[in-house]
Amino acid sequence: ELFGLNSGPSTRGHRFHHNEWVTVSSPGAYQEVLRDAKVLVDVEERRARIAEQVTALANKGEVVSLSDDLLDEVTGLVEWPAALRGSFDPAFLSVPSQALISAMKTHQKYFHLNDADSGALLPAFITVANIESQQPDQVVSGNERVIRPRLSDAAFFFSNDKQSPLISRQERLGSVVFQQKLGS
């Protein structure tokens, strides 16, 4: 008993792949028992597996953006990583790549792909699921469906921002309070 809670040698495996109790016979067996139950306990091992899977999905002539911050975040979100590649409508590439990347990275935790020669953003992404799906095409389709409205929002705001020249916004900057005690 610790802090009023009972503890023991049993834990649960991955909630989809092995949703059963497993018994850990010794501290040294902990990682292996959970690996058999489809949970990668070692954060560095999980991170390396994600990086390997994501990189493997880039085609020849493509470079995947493996930013440390996104890789760390995704590593913390999954127990049994399975990387999948999806795509989006190339028409969205008329929006500045920074806006598209932000939508993919911040909202959906997707890794984006660039052309190896030109550096241009490609209409593709890589997501990391927490399951090895029996129907990966459906998982990809769902992710493609989810990113579409995010990219549409980015296109909408970019289009609206282009309606007014940048200089016309300068006047309003004087009334923006960045920090209450520092003024405008």
Positions of PLM-derived features:
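Hydrophobic/aromatic pocket-lining and membrane-interface residues
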Residues: E1, S184
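Structured, charged N-terminal subsegments at the starts of enzyme catalytic cores
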Residues: N160, L166-I167
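His/Asp/Glu-rich acidic catalytic environments and adjacent acidic regulatory segments
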Residues: L2-D161
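Active-site flanking loop/helix segments enriched in acidic
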Residues: F92-A99, V128-I131, I167-G183
